[in-house]
Structures are given as C-alpha cells and as structure tokens.
C-alpha cells in the first residue's frame, strides 16, 4: 500500500523493488509495451521510483538505468527535449541499444531494443495507429524466443481507459478490439509455448458516460431506467475489484 500518485515507493517515499526488477535479478529478459509515453504511470510502475507520477523526465532517466531488454511506446520529449539538456537517446546508444524513433524496425538479437515513436503518446486507433500494439508484441515475443532465458513482459492497452474518461464510445470500443487482437497474438504464442503464463487484468475500471454512445446507439442506454437521453456515470475510477484471467 502507498499513496495516490506514487510510483514504486512506499507511503514514506522509500523505493520498493518492482516485479520487473526482481525478475531481472533472476536472469529474466524484460519487456514493456505501451500506447502512452513509456514514462506514463502504468509502464513506469514496473521500473521507476518517484514520489509523483508526473515526474516524467526523472522516470525516463531511471528507465535508462534499469536497462529493460525491449520497450516500445511514446514520450520522445522526455528523452531528448529535457529541461536538464541531457540526451537520453545518446545514453541508450552508449548502452548498446538498437534505438528507433520512427518505426518498429526489426529488433537486433545481440542488443537491447528501444522504440520511442512519438513526442507524446502513440496515436489512438481511430487516429490511424494501425497495428502497432499487436506488431510490437509479436516482435518482442520473437525477440525473447531467440534466447534460452525466460522473460517477463507487460503490454498495456492504454487507451481503453482514455476513451472512458473522454466519454468517447468509438475510441473505447476500437481500443478494446485492438487489445483483443493483440491478445490473440499472445494466445498463439502460449499455445505454441505452453510453459508460458499469460495474465490478463486491469489496474482499475474507468467509468464512462452513456451519452458517449448516442451516435452509435441513439435509441439505447447502457444504464437501465435512463432511456435514450443517457446520463453520466461516475467520472472516476471505481473501487471495485477487477477480474484476473490467466492462461498457461
């Protein structure tokens, strides 16, 4: 337990080892894939230790030190447009990374691989992202599979949450479908490599607003008794427990 907005620290702001760091110590390969900036709260929670989630430049610097084997996401500006003037891309190259800031180029087997492909987050599905999430996931799985060492990877379908906050039904649904496609890639891998554990969960729900569905379902409401006019649900993260599904 810790406080709101903390990343990788206890309630008294002391660093606490993450699951990624623990598995690194045991010889695991590690990977992180996100649609947001790679310094955003969810990916950062696997490697960073800061007192506030918005400390993006410090989080980026810590990512360099952790040396994750494969990571992909956005957030260029936190690496090469920093207030301290540091060029973290140069530091990645000095640590023998294959770095690409333009596209998901083929990973280099003998190196760690970093893909930072947007100044902010990667575009949403309805903004023309394409198959970035499933392709990055497939690339990472192929990369890890070339070595004998086990691996740990976190893949985040980030914008399902964002669509809910924005009350944008089209965005939310398209992101769920894209995450489902990515999940299919992982399930195929698990089927071919049965000694693999897949865990699918969420860190929270995101309550939406059924008014966001009016354009798609003009005569229906997701909330019984509301009618087609719709109305707001909670605009925050509900405190309910989330499901955990596993395979393998």
Provide a role label for each language-model segment:
Residues 10-14, 51:
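Aromatic/His-enriched, Gly/Pro-containing loop or helix-boundary segments
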């Amino acid at each position: 337990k810790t406080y709101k907005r903390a990343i990788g620290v206890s309630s008294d702001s002391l660093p606490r080892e993450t699951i990624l760091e623990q598995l690194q110590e045991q010889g695991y390969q590690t990977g992180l894939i996100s649609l947001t900036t790679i310094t955003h709260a969810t990916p950062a929670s696997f490697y960073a230790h800061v007192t506030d989630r918005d400390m993006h430049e410090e989080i980026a610097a810590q990512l360099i030190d952790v040396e994750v084997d494969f990571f992909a996401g956005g957030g260029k500006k936190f690496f090469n447009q920093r207030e301290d003037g540091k060029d973290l891309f140069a530091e990645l190259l000095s640590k023998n990374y294959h770095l690409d800031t333009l596209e998901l180029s083929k990973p280099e087997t003998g190196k760690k691989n970093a893909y930072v492909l947007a100044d902010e987050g990667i575009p949403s599905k309805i903004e023309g992202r394409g198959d970035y999430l499933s392709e990055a996931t497939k690339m990472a799985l192929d990369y890890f599979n070339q070595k004998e060492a086990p691996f740990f990877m976190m893949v985040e379908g980030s914008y399902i949450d964002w669509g809910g906050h924005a009350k944008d039904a089209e965005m939310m649904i398209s992101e769920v479908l894209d995450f489902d496609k990515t999940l299919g890639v992982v399930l195929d891998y698990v089927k071919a490599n049965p000694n693999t554990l897949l865990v699918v969960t969420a860190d929270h729900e995101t309550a939406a607003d059924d008014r966001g569905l009016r354009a798609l379902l003009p005569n229906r409401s997701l909330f019984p008794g509301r009618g087609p006019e719709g109305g707001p649900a909670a605009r925050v993260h509900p405190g309910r427990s989330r499901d955990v599904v596993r395979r393998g």
